[in-house]
Amino acid sequence: MGKGGNQGEGSTERQAPMPTFRWEEIQKHNLRTDRWLVIDRKVYNVTKWSQRHPGGHRVIGHYSGEDATDAFRAFHLDLDFVGKFLKPLLIGELAPEEPSLDRGKSSQITEDFRALKKTAEDMNLFKTNHLFFFLLLSHIIVMESLAWFILSYFGTGWIPTLVTAFVLATSQAQAGWLQHDYGHLSVYKKSIWNHVVHKFVIGHLKGASANWWNHRHFQHHAKPNIFHKDPDIKSLHVFVLGEWQPLEYGKKKLKYLPYNHQHEYFFLIGPPLLIPMYFQYQIIMTMISRRDWVDLAWAISYYMRFFYTYIPFYGILGALVFLNFIRFLESHWFVWVTQMNHLVMEIDLDHYRDWFSSQLAATCNVEQSFFNDWFSGHLNFQIEHHLFPTMPRHNLHKIAPLVKSLCAKHGIEYQEKPLLRALIDIVSSLKKSGELWLDAYLHK
């Protein structure tokens, strides 16, 4: 057991030598009301401070009781600056005889991954090409302008309306990928400028909330495809995913829906409804319930601009229908792209793997091409993006060969597939999970 375990959070007066702890004790502090974590062998009590964590209390809580060094380094740009917030939370360090990593984390893989990140830094792969992002923003604004021009010049017949809807859905999808860049702090050196532009892109160009996205998306990056930690696999009993969940549902005789047909009803309620029905409602309610008035103001500016532009063409009701049709189209694009990298991979309880292994277990890539890069917002390089979330996306292909080499060295599978195959695999994965559920439901 550790020594000095009663020392409170935020203590500024410490006796020498610093209290030491064993992993056995640290791992007990993994509750919502009792959170310790380890960074660079230092032990921190983040119980109270997690409520003030800019990235949200959940993401920091997902690493309670374990080493969070690589996650800490992956998410933050200025380690010296954020390190100042950790100092008052320091309560001790690992005992000298304790390994730096806990449980299923590989020290050799971790050492090699950190060397790889240093190589990426030496290659200037975290340096931004600002012209690239300017052109991305510009082509979004051009599409927004083109949509207005089409209706102004050709009128509001069915064909101009459909063409305009597809143009605006494309603009929304591309704005979604662009806000993702700023949300990950991968454009500017200073976090503040990333945050400011992020609010503009996700708020004014899309009508969504930066804080809602941050709190949700960083959990996904911290613990991808981990039940009870990754919100992206929280399916609200609509789907059963992976192998563990369908077996659990089957054994417990849970049948909220006929999951053996989920690969069929996915087409009806997955891609069509996620954004217009679920996300749109959840985002608005989250901003109101959390009194996030800044994000709400940005979102309102989007809706004001949209209705000011399109009510003269369609009237109030028509503009509302037009908006939701655009969301409907965008939702298909968003769901297929975001699920092709993760849904087909391992989805399970937390095995407490090291950063590199955990990201590779939950992530696969899609082959590179100019279209695939544009269509997916470079999320076809999802493996590299998950390993280095602050790396500008135009550099992800440059680090990919080195990631492949590291995978080969340690016998870790690096999955990369054609775009069509990746999309088909989504349906195949749902079908497989549904069959596992049915077998367990009937026979176990």
From Swiss-Prot:
Q: Specify the domain of life of the species encoding this protein.
A: Eukaryota
Q: What keywords tag this UniProt record?
A: Electron transport, Endoplasmic reticulum, Fatty acid biosynthesis, Fatty acid metabolism, Lipid biosynthesis, Lipid metabolism, Membrane, Oxidoreductase, Transmembrane, Transmembrane helix, Transport
- PROSITE patterns on file: CYTOCHROME_B5_2
User: Which parts of the chain does the record assign to the membrane side Lumenal?
Assistant: 152, 286-305
Q: What class of enzyme is it?
A: oxidoreductase
Q: What induces it?
A: Induced by dietary PUFA-deficient diet. Induced by a fat-free diet and by a diet containing triolein (18:1n-9) as the only fat source. Down-regulated in liver by dietary PUFA.
Q: Where is this motif: Histidine box-1?
A: 180-184
Pathway info: Lipid metabolism; polyunsaturated fatty acid biosynthesis
Q: Where is the signal peptide?
A: none
Motif Histidine box-2 is found at 217-221
**GO biological process, alphabetically ordered:** alpha-linolenic acid metabolic process; arachidonate metabolite production involved in inflammatory response; fatty acid biosynthetic process; fatty acid derivative biosynthetic process; linoleic acid metabolic process; long-chain fatty acid biosynthetic process; positive regulation of cellular response to oxidative stress; unsaturated fatty acid biosynthetic process
Q: Where does tissue-level expression of this protein occur? A: Highly expressed in the adrenal gland, liver, brain, and testis, tissues where lipogenesis and steroidogenesis are active. Also detected in lung, heart, and skeletal muscle.
Q: Which Gene3D superfamilies match?
A: Cytochrome b5-like heme/steroid binding domain
Quote the InterPro entries the UniProt record gives.
Answer: Cyt_B5-like_heme/steroid-bd, Cyt_B5-like_heme/steroid_sf, FA_desaturase_dom, Fatty_acid_desaturase
Q: Where are the transmembrane segments?
A: 131-151, 153-173, 265-285, 306-326
Motif location (Histidine box-3)? 382-386
Q: Which GO terms describe its cellular component?
A: endoplasmic reticulum membrane; membrane
Q: Which Pfam families match?
A: Cyt-b5, FA_desaturase
- Protein topology in the membrane: Multi-pass membrane protein
Give the family this protein belongs to, as stated in its UniProt record: Belongs to the fatty acid desaturase type 1 family.
Q: Write the protein's name.
A: Acyl-CoA 6-desaturase
Q: Which organism is it from?
A: Mus musculus (Mouse)
| Taxonomic lineage of the native organism | Eukaryota, Metazoa, Chordata, Craniata, Vertebrata
